[in-house]
Swiss-Prot record:
One of its GO terms (molecular function) is kinase activity. Belongs to the DNA mismatch repair MutL/HexB family. GO terms for cellular component: mismatch repair complex. PROSITE patterns: DNA_MISMATCH_REPAIR_1. The keyword Kinase applies. Coiled coil: none annotated. Highly expressed in kidney, spleen, adrenal gland, ovary and cerebellum and to a lower extent in liver, esophagus, stomach, duodenum, colon, bladder, uterus, lung, pancreas and cerebrum. Not expressed in heart. It comes from Homo sapiens. It comes from the Eukaryota. This is Putative postmeiotic segregation increased 2-like protein 1. The gene is PMS2P1. Keywords: Kinase, Transferase.
């Protein structure tokens, strides 16, 4: 019977197992070595630090001399053990003699050195051992006084590798990462890169117990940036969302300013109702809106926006600053937002009733999109007056578009009364060509 010496110490338990198997090897090894005093498994494991390093878990069914375990049953580990003779005689090849290796030198792969595998299957009340070697196979079932705990099993499976390794991999003809007797890659030799074998064994353990997940959730920052792109794909969409936001607030006068064709700055000011102070926090958060509260409210929506995505997406794509003053407030407020729609600066600011939204460096958080936007913005500028006349109708207001560049362009506006798209286009482009007040 194998008892747990030292209070469930796994190394003591392995010490007993290796000792008993070492006694059998001592009887078998004399004939193999040819008269030399053989070294037992335990002696090899204590003298050579790399000799008793464990392999990974056996993932496939194991059948070896009465040792039988299926996948997912009792945990099975394999220990690669090296047995060699103590005295190395000088072999003779023809008329040439090879020099005798020193006692501390690692022998080359000869008949005096053999690789064996010790399989241990831990059950609830017993441990089954199987020794696989060249021409010898031994299997036993040994009861345990008490079953091993999870922590002790882990220490048995993956003991810490000693710091000092008396094995030169470069001069060895043994392949460091060949397939072992347990059917798993790895082995009892140090990594040729000098890394710790324990970390690789732990990775092998996790890969064998849990399958690697190829589908993983995207982090919230990336999701916010990815989802904001389709909401505001272009400059015209950004202007449209800001203008519609002012219309929903009841604005009758909307000013639109573009700096460097909208690359540096987009500013939309409207004389709407403004925003109350208690609503500042949710002003630019994703899916925060005052238009609806649930899906059933959609048939009653009478505004342009109701999803609560426009300002949040603009925050994710640019630097947004909002200046507002509610009808009930005595002084305005200037709010600076980060890319997540959170307020990072809040200061009193003189502002008339309404709200002004400033968008700086549109698409700056998307480098490829920003570069494409800068390259094509001048080409799209020619279509902007037409889009302005088509999308922005002001039946009860008199919006004006005052260009900053070039200076020779004159102010142009649409009539304050409802009219057709053709009338708007003729009015705007005739004012650009002939000046204000020209006839059609």
């Amino acid at each position: 019977m194998v008892t747990m010496c030292g209070g469930h110490r796994p190394e003591n338990f392995l010490h007993q197992v290796l000792t008993e198997f070492g006694e059998e090897l001592a009887g078998e090894g004399k004939s193999e070595v040819g008269g030399g005093a053989p070294r037992s498994y335990l002696q090899v494991a204590s003298a050579e630090c790399w000799a008793a390093a464990p392999a990974v878990h056996v993932g496939e069914p194991v059948h070896a001399g009465g040792l039988h375990t299926e996948r997912g049953a009792d945990p099975v580990i394999g220990l690669y053990l090296v047995h060699r003779g103590g005295a190395c005689q000088t072999p003779t090849v023809g008329n040439r003699q090879t020099p005798t290796l020193g006692i501390h030198a690692r022998p080359r792969r000869r008949a005096t050195t053999s690789l064996l595998t010790l399989l241990l299957a831990f059950g609830k009340n017993a441990v089954r051992c199987a020794l696989i070697g060249p021409g010898s196979l031994t299997s036993r079932t040994r009861p345990l006084t008490e079953p091993l705990g999870e922590k002790e099993r882990r220490e048995v499976f993956f003991p810490p590798r000693p710091e000092r390794v008396e094995h030169n991999v470069e001069s060895s003809r043994w392949e460091p990462r060949r397939r072992g007797a347990c059917g798993s890659r790895g082995g009892n030799f140090p990594s040729p890169r000098g890394g710790s074998g324990v970390a690789s064994l732990e990775r092998a353990e996790s890969s064998s117990t849990e399958p690697a997940k190829a589908i993983k959730p995207i982090d919230r920052k990336s999701v916010h940036q990815i989802c904001s792109g389709p909401v505001v794909p272009s400059l015209s969409t950004a202007v449209k969302e800001l203008v519609e936001n002012s219309l929903d607030a009841g604005a009758t006068n909307i000013d639109l300013k573009l700096k460097d064709y909208g690359v540096d700055l987009i500013e939309v000011s409207g004389n709407g109702c403004g925003v109350e102070e208690e609503n500042f926090e949710g002003l630019t958060l994703k899916h925060h809106t005052s238009k609806i509260q649930e899906f059933a409210d959609l048939p009653q929506v009478e505004t342009f926006g109701f999803r609560g995505e426009a300002l949040s997406s603009l925050c994710a794509l640019s630097d947004v600053t909002i200046s507002t003053c509610h009808v009930s407030a005595k002084v305005g407020t200037r709010l600076v937002f980060d890319h997540y729609g959170k307020i990072i600066q809040k200061t009193p600011y003189p502002h008339p009733r309404g709200m002004t939204v400033s968008v700086k460096q549109l698409f700056s958080t998307l480098p490829v999109h920003h570069k494409e936007f800068q390259r094509n913005i001048k080409k799209k500028r020619a279509c902007f007056p037409f889009a302005f006349c088509r999308d922005c109708q002001f039946p009860e207001a008199s919006p004006a578009m005052l260009p900053v560049q070039p200076a020779e362009l004159t102010p142009r506006s649409t009539p304050p009364h409802p009219c057709s798209l053709e009338d708007n286009v003729i009015t705007v482009f005739s004012s650009v060509k002939n000046g204000p007040g020209s006839s059609r």
